[in-house]
């Protein structure tokens, strides 16, 4: 839902603005042209930001010094959140860095598009709503043992969207 709101807002503000053409440029010139275009688009979009607030389970976290990215999942989907120490404060950022995969967070901020093109939320306030008692497995490895998947069905439903979709469809049929 957040993605569709942002894309409609972006289309309204940027209109028919063409993508930057890098044909005939060397790698350095192309990179500079793409960065300049990104900065211009970001400046236009930052004039009227879309503020959002949402809650969900943290499924993935990348900490990079003073800033972090995390994926937050709820019933409707996943969205990436950008959390910087400058935006939320030193104490809140230190608490966030100690958090685990599976914790449930409430995030308030504004929507933006990263340089890689992914729609994200720049967090201005991060609240831990519920601490995960059991740390979830890593995103890339997940649960590989079949017996463990059946014994810890709740973890499999959280980690694998395909399993969750099958479960929901089966429940609707019955």
Predicted regions and their residues:
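Class II aminoacyl-tRNA synthetase catalytic cores and aaRS-like
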Residues: 1-174
């Amino acid at each position: 839902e957040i993605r569709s709101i942002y894309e409609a807002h972006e289309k309204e503000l940027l209109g028919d603005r063409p993508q930057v053409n890098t044909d005939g440029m060397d790698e350095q010139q192309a990179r500079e042209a793409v960065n300049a275009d990104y900065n211009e688009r970001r400046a236009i979009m930052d004039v009227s930001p879309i503020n959002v607030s949402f809650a969900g389970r943290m499924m993935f976290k990348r900490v990079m010094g003073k800033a972090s990215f995390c994926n937050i999942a709820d019933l409707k989907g996943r969205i990436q959140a950008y959390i910087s120490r400058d935006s939320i404060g030193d104490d809140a950022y230190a608490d966030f860095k100690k958090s685990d995969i599976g914790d449930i967070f409430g995030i308030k901020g504004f929507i933006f598009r990263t340089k890689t093109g992914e729609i994200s939320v720049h967090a201005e306030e991060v609240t831990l709503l519920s601490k995960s008692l059991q740390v979830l497995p890593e995103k890339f490895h997940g649960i590989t043992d079949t017996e463990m998947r059946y014994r810890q069905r709740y973890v499999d439903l959280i980690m694998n969207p395909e399993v969750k979709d099958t479960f929901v469809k089966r429940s609707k049929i019955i």
